């Protein structure tokens, strides 16, 4: 085993990387509330894992979506547990994100030189809300259908561009297969990719600038 480690150490300098990670200075004022961002990340990772597991059974069509969710909950091995964990971690992610935003704001973590860290955090907040909207529609039940119909219908009040914007969101004039396909693609590919990119930017900035000091 030591020879394998030495082989990687010689080429990648693993020990230097580990020392840099473990020796990072942590200010003495840091408390449990500074863990809220990390908990949000953990919830996101749980979402990715459980969501990926459900893609093996979920069918993104208006005729089969609801039945496939029923199959996950009643027949697939541990499907009920995987979907329940997905829902619980989604709620937890939103709650932890909100508390994290309050903590950062109340401790002045958005001030110079951390403005860009705050901006990436705001983008992550928008992406998290988008996860909720798109995911809500996927079971294709009554609640999801009417929620999507209302949310996508909001831009219609905008003069001139309102109706085209609604059609862009829905993929057609009404909520149907095109809407479900778009929301499924957003929920399972586009939003996770964007979230991963902005999380990486967010953490690299924190890593570079360190944790903000006390007020």
Curated annotation (Swiss-Prot):
Free-text comment on the cofactor: Binds 2 heme b groups non-covalently with two histidine residues as axial ligands. Binds one heme group covalently by a single cysteine link with no axial amino acid ligand. This heme was named heme ci.
PROSITE patterns hit by this protein: CYTB_NTER (PS51002)
One Pfam family from the record: Cytochrome_B
Predominant cellular place of this UniProt entry's protein: plastid
Record-linked InterPro entries: Cyt_b/b6_N (IPR005797), Cyt_B6_PetB (IPR023530), Cytb/b6-like_sf (IPR027387), Cytochrome_b_N_euk/bac (IPR048259), Di-haem_cyt_TM (IPR016174)
Membrane topology label: Multi-pass membrane protein
Miscellaneous comment text of the record: Heme 1 (or BH or b566) is high-potential and absorbs at about 566 nm, and heme 2 (or BL or b562) is low-potential and absorbs at about 562 nm.
Keyword RNA-binding: no
Binding of heme c, residues: 35
Alphabetic keyword roster: Chloroplast, Electron transport, Heme, Iron, Membrane, Metal-binding, Photosynthesis, Plastid, Thylakoid, Transmembrane, Transmembrane helix, Transport
Gene Ontology biological-process annotations: photosynthesis; respiratory electron transport chain
Job description of the protein: Component of the cytochrome b6-f complex, which mediates electron transfer between photosystem II (PSII) and photosystem I (PSI), cyclic electron flow around PSI, and state transitions.
Chain positions recorded as heme b 1 binding sites: 100, 202
Superkingdom per UniProt: Eukaryota
Protein name: Cytochrome b6
One GO MF term: oxidoreductase activity
Family of this protein: Belongs to the cytochrome b family. PetB subfamily.
Localization terms from the record: Plastid, Chloroplast thylakoid membrane
The keyword Ribonucleoprotein is assigned to this record: no
Transmembrane segments: 32-52, 90-110, 116-136, 186-206
Binding site for heme b 2: 86, 187
Subunit structure as annotated in this protein's UniProt entry: The 4 large subunits of the cytochrome b6-f complex are cytochrome b6, subunit IV (17 kDa polypeptide, PetD), cytochrome f and the Rieske protein, while the 4 small subunits are PetG, PetL, PetM and PetN. The complex functions as a dimer.
UniProt GO cellular component terms: chloroplast thylakoid membrane; membrane
Cofactor(s) annotated in UniProt: heme b; heme c
